[in-house]
A protein has these predicted regions:
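Functional cores that coordinate and move charged inorganic groups
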Residues: 1-93
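Active-site lining segments that contact anionic ligands and/or coordinate catalytic metals
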Residues: 67-70, 136-140, 161
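Short hydrophobic beta-strand segments
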Residues: 133-150
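Catalytic cores of secreted or luminal carbohydrate-active enzymes
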Residues: 76-78, 82-134
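Conserved small/polar residues in nucleotide/adenosyl-binding loops
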Residues: 167-169
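Generic recognition of flexible, low-complexity loop/linker segments
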Residues: 58-62, 125-131, 144, 154-155
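Divalent metal-coordination and catalytic microenvironments
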Residues: 73, 104, 159
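Long hydrophobic segments that form regular secondary structure
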Residues: 91-94, 107-110, 146-161
Length: 169
């Protein structure tokens, strides 16, 4: 983000990865709405979406494949002397830290109000994912060998680091 950006937060823009539990998308939107309302009350500038998407399984998003809610927010680049905005105001470093602080406190308040419901959704989602009715039930993936043994070993190492079950034949 450049200095003339403001503050970016969820929800992400389309496309959304279709392998993410719908409850996580629901909770992400609830957290984003509460955070937006906190910024609106203070008349702070922010935006959602733009380059922030949840298709690529990396950055703040990877945790959602493990059942956790990933929350991304970023403050524009800031110098210790502040940044002059296009309309002439100066945004100080102190203000940018305040944005991060308010976002964090708002996220904690949302979590406090919704902890039991979030745990229930998490538990129900985990049970479904390993059930015989899951869209992931009875799936097997085969990786055919090639002459590039290093690439195959690297993939195996990464999958095993994530506690995935592998059968070597």
């Amino acid at each position: 983000m450049g200095a003339q950006d403001t503050f970016m937060t969820g929800p992400p823009r389309e496309p959304i990865n279709k392998n993410i539990d719908e409850d996580l998308i629901k909770w992400g939107n609830i957290f984003a709405q509460d955070q937006a309302e906190a910024f609106d009350k203070k008349n702070w500038r922010f935006y959602t979406g733009e380059w922030h998407e949840d298709l690529y399984p990396g950055y703040s998003f990877y945790v959602q494949f493990r059942g956790s809610l990933g929350i991304l927010y970023e403050q524009s680049r800031m110098s210790e002397d502040g940044v002059r905005r296009p309309e002439g105001t100066i945004q100080s470093y102190k203000e940018s830290v305040h944005h991060q602080f308010v976002s964090t406190i708002e996220n904690l308040n949302t979590l406090k109000l919704n902890t039991k419901a979030m745990y229930k959704d998490y538990w129900d989602g985990r049970k479904y994912n390993i059930s015989k009715d899951s869209k992931y039930a009875n799936q097997t993936f085969v990786v055919l060998p090639s002459k590039n043994h290093g690439r195959l070993h690297s993939l195996v190492d990464k999958l095993e680091a994530q506690d995935l079950s592998l059968i070597h034949i």
